[in-house]
């Protein structure tokens, strides 16, 4: 029923001709259920606006803060592991394979890692550690006390790193 209603909505919004993927995405974006894995890809792609909408959607849908944190922190840890392997002399493709990074994330990592500094990744790892405490109820100076606000700050820090790598 929901899919049928979306098709009817698309017919009303765009009555003539073939639809592009962008038109379909724009029409259904606000009703789409979000998941943490798509959030992860959007963060790694540096899509700041989309990331903010997805975080708002995940919060509204009642997603657990710790699960969202896990997804973000896992990406940060993986970036750091692959970067460390590269620093140890491993070629990027081998480091990605060894860390089980493939599919869409592989391409995103290939774009990010050559330009990401060790210091930036260390700062992100520290931020992820702080947010881990916040989503579990700890209060940290200079950080939002609300878990979702802290998650947004962490996601935007990672977005800035990935945007700089473009």
Predicted regions span which residues?
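Short, basic/aromatic recognition patches that contact phosphate-bearing ligands
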Residues: 128
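Short active-site loop/helix that positions an aromatic residue
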Residues: 145
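Non-catalytic interfacial helical region
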Residues: 1-41, 133-141, 150-166
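Hydrophobic packing residues in well-ordered alpha-helices of helical domains and bundles
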Residues: 3, 69, 121, 148-151
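Small-residue-rich helix-loop
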Residues: 15-123, 163
């Amino acid at each position: 029923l929901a899919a049928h209603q979306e098709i009817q909505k698309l017919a009303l919004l765009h009555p003539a001709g073939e639809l592009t993927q962008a038109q379909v995405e724009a029409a259904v974006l606000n009703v789409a259920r979000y998941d943490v894995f798509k959030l992860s890809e959007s963060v790694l792609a540096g899509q700041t606006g989309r990331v903010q909408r997805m975080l708002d959607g995940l919060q509204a849908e009642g997603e657990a803060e710790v699960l969202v944190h896990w997804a973000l922190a896992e990406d940060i840890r993986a970036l750091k592991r692959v970067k460390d392997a590269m620093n140890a002399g491993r070629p990027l493709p081998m480091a990605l394979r060894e860390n089980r990074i493939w599919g869409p994330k592989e391409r995103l990592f290939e774009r990010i890692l050559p330009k990401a500094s060790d210091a930036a990744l260390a700062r992100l790892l520290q931020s992820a550690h702080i947010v881990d405490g916040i989503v579990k109820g700890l209060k940290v100076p200079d950080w939002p006390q609300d878990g979702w606000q802290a998650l947004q700050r962490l996601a935007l820090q990672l977005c800035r790193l990935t945007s700089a790598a473009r």
